């Protein structure tokens, strides 16, 4: 059975990507708790949506944590197999993916995951501030357009920045890549905000 799985994995990992254009890709590193030689291995996952709207797994690979070297290896392999630069990539801010994608597919735009970002912001706030902060963050990523999102981000920084500057900076420092999804069709926004 293991040999069959290995054959299927090799076939999947070597298939041509020349005939497919991926508009958007979502990336994440999944840390699994299994007993291996090292505890720093994670699964690097890249899912893409084609121009026809079909979503599919593009690549799955093991990597050392979520290092830029591991992501670059995965991306270079996809490029070698014919993958062209996706228009937009969505992922969390902790990934080494961003350095790797800038090197391998420099024309790909970046969108940070709002689910992860919300968790990061809340971690920098006392629990008593969470309900209001969640509402304020939702006003940013659920705004009617990019201008309203930027205005909501400024309001968030004004409300929370004096007492909790680290929480506010998590939004203001990354604002351009948090609101990038607004540059794409509105019907795609719900999918592009998060991994």
Task: Go through the PLM ranges and name each one.
Residues 2-91, 95, 99, 104-107, ...:
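RNase H-like nuclease fold core
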Residues 41, 95, 116-119, 131-135, ...:
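Non-catalytic, well-ordered alpha-helical scaffold segments
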Residues 68-71, 126, 130:
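Short, charged, low-complexity patches
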Residues 128-145:
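A polyampholytic, Gly/Pro-enriched intrinsically disordered region
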């Amino acid at each position: 059975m293991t040999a069959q799985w290995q054959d299927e994995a090799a076939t999947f990992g070597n298939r041509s990507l020349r005939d497919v254009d991926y508009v958007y890709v979502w990336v994440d590193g999944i840390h699994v708790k299994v007993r291996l030689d090292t505890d720093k291995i994670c699964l690097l996952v890249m899912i893409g949506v084609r121009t026809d709207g079909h979503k599919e797994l593009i690549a799955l690979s093991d990597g050392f944590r979520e290092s830029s070297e591991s992501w670059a290896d995965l991306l270079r392999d996809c490029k070698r197999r014919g993958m062209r630069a996706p228009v937009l990539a969505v992922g969390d801010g902790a990934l080494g993916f961003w350095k790797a994608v800038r090197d391998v597919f420099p024309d790909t735009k970046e969108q940070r995951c709002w689910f992860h970002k919300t968790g990061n912001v809340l971690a920098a706030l006392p629990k008593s501030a969470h309900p209001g902060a969640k509402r304020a963050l939702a006003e940013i990523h659920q705004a009617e357009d990019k201008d309203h999102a930027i205005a909501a981000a400024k309001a968030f920084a004004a409300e929370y920045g004096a007492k909790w500057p680290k929480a506010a900076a998590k939004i203001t420092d990354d604002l351009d890549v948090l609101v990038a999804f607004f540059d794409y069709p509105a019907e795609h926004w719900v999918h592009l905000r998060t991994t």
